[in-house]
Amino acid sequence: SEMCIRDRNKKTVFESGAILIYLAELSGKFYNTKDRLEINQWLMAQMGYVGPMLGQHHQFHHYNPGKSKFGEDRYFKISRRIYRELDERLSNSKYLSGSNYTIADIGTFPWIARHEWHDIGLKSYKNLTRWYEEISEREGVKKGFAFMNESETPPKPCLLYTSPSPRDPK
């Protein structure tokens, strides 16, 4: 199913990235003009790379484990590369698109919030962990998790899982 919203004026917007841009422009928040190019680049990276690749990882590792060694290996390696790339970016920047929390962070965070499904160990990535923990403490993020499931909060980062993937080097 595709994500879609309809506003008070009966304007319909579909696709998560377009919805984030639309709502940010309406509210005047999380999408400042000065950093718009950088924000768009990181939001598009999430939409075209981070989300689809981690989504494939979920398919092979979480929903259908043991069905395709090729798929599991491929998406594990890509997921680890995504973590490294995000960690490297966040070594030079407080947030993905600069010094301010933006829709690029809002779009990317839910994928990293499923870090327990990635068999990687978030705490192995110092800068990504800092970013994740800081965003996890935002009131809006907590409210979002509570809205989806009252007992759920953003998962805490860990170094190793109780049953780490044999593919994940220490």
Located regions from the model:
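GST-like domain detector, emphasizing the conserved glutathione-binding G-site
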Residues: 1, 6-77, 87
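Single conserved hydrophobic/aromatic residue that forms the stacking wall/gate
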Residues: 2-5, 161-170
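Residue-level signal for nonpolar/aromatic packing positions in well-ordered secondary structure
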Residues: 6, 19, 86, 105, ...
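Structural helix-adjacent loops and short alpha-helical linkers that scaffold large soluble proteins
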Residues: 32, 74, 119-125
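All-alpha amphipathic helical-bundle segments outside canonical DNA-binding/catalytic cores
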Residues: 32-38, 42, 93-104
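GST superfamily/GST-like fold recognition
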Residues: 54, 58, 96-121, 132-135
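Surface-exposed helix-capping loop/turn segments at secondary-structure junctions
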Residues: 88-99, 139-144
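Acidic/histidine-enriched, glycine/proline-rich intrinsically disordered or flexible terminal extensions
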Residues: 152-163
